[in-house]
Amino acid sequence: MLTAEEKAAVTAFWGKVHVDEVGGEALGRLLVVYPWTQRFFESFGDLSSADAVMNNAKVKAHGKKVLDSFSNGMKHLDDLKGTFAALSELHCDKLHVDPENFKLLGNVLVVVLARHFGKEFTPVLQADFQKVVTGVANALAHRYH
């Protein structure tokens, strides 16, 4: 999946990411850009507008939780399936989340990283992160296969 050089680049960069801020924004953007994903978050209260979603404390908190799990995956890039096995089971068997949503969230995360880091998030780093988010999405979808 990733070369040693790519792993070093993404893990070094990830150390600069503020998971609370980036996670909340990424999940919020997912819910705004792909509104059908909101059905999994009905208990989060007001999701009636982009402003409501982006300022929703529960969205921000869950976004941080999502990126905390992603951070754990960044420590286990050689075993993403094992790292995300329990979350794959939860999202498949209990929450019935469409696995396509994992890909969407990964792509939104890449957009948010580019927005936050600008020129520092080079095209090469973006390509490396695209491999990571694809690997995480596949690991989360593993239970569905």
UniProtKB/Swiss-Prot annotation:
Give residue ranges for domain Globin: 1-145
GO cellular component terms, A-Z? blood microparticle; haptoglobin-hemoglobin complex; hemoglobin complex
Q: Does the keyword Transferase apply?
A: no
**Tissue expr:** Red blood cells.
Q: Which of the residues bear the PTM S-nitrosocysteine?
A: 92
Which residues are annotated with the PTM Phosphoserine? 43
CDD domains, per the entry: Hb-beta-like
Give a GO molecular function annotation for the protein: peroxidase activity
Recorded hits in Gene3D superfamilies, A to Z, give: Globins
Q: Which Pfam families does the record match to this protein?
A: Globin (PF00042)
Q: Which keywords belong to this entry?
A: Acetylation, Heme, Iron, Metal-binding, Oxygen transport, Phosphoprotein, S-nitrosylation, Transport
State where heme b binds.
62, 91
Tell me the InterPro entries matching this sequence. Answer: Globin, Globin-like_sf, Globin/Proto, Hemoglobin_b, Hemoglobin_oxygen_transport
Spell out the subunit comment.
Answer: Heterotetramer of two alpha chains and two beta chains.
Function according to Swiss-Prot or TrEMBL: Involved in oxygen transport from the lung to the various peripheral tissues.
Similarity comment: Belongs to the globin family.
Q: What is this protein called?
A: Hemoglobin subunit beta
Q: Which organism is it from?
A: Bison bonasus (European bison)
Which gene specifies this protein's sequence? Answer: HBB
